[in-house]
């Protein structure tokens, strides 16, 4: 495939740029478009970055901001439909994104923290009309996460699909700026555990 900026990405080579991720992730709608709200992957990644703990850790915020970035090349396939091969391709693209940004793979602790924040975000999205109706009833022992729901509602109050879809819109620019800011922070943090794999 060719990205927004013209980068060639295949199963074997290439990685989308920060601009590609910012623009394209705001055009990919979560939950296969089943929600009452057209809620993009890019907005989801911003939400996850707000929910990851500890939130003063720039490495965790960075990996949260990038946790679905590979989907701009492989699409957002709902988990029950994703094959083992599709997951392997997504993982390979994700690894190339990290390499292109000069960052290591996240530590196991960071992966777990991002996974938890991702789950909290998904449940909040399911509660606020971003997924298909009845999402919360498909989740075992579902309990509303008021903190995550409140954070999501703050975004929803300001969100418009037009400002997400346009490359020069507010949300692609906000996402790009946030990634670049956090990248600068982690480049100054040479002793963090997630830095151990970096050259």
What is each of the regions a protein language model found here?
Residues 1-199:
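Metal-dependent phosphohydrolase cores
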């Amino acid at each position: 495939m060719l990205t927004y900026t013209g980068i060639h990405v295949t199963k074997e080579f290439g990685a989308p740029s920060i601009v590609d991720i910012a623009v394209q992730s705001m055009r990919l709608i979560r939950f296969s478009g089943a929600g009452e709200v057209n809620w993009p992957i890019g907005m989801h990644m911003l939400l996850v970055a707000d929910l990851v703990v500890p939130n003063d850790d720039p490495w965790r915020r960075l990996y949260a901001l990038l946790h679905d970035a590979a989907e701009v090349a492989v699409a957002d396939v709902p988990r029950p439909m994703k094959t083992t091969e599709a997951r392997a391709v997504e993982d390979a693209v994700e690894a190339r994104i990290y390499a292109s940004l000069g960052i290591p793979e996240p530590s196991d602790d960071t992966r777990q923290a991002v996974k938890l924040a991702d789950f909290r975000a998904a449940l909040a999205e399911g509660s606020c009309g971003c997924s298909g109706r009845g999402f919360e009833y498909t989740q075992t022992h579902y309990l509303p996460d008021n903190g995550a729901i409140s954070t999501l509602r703050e975004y929803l109050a300001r969100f418009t699909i037009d400002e997400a879809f346009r490359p020069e819109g507010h949300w692609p620019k906000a996402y790009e700026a946030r990634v670049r800011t956090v990248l600068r922070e982690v480049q100054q943090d040479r002793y963090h555990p997630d830095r151990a794999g970096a050259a």
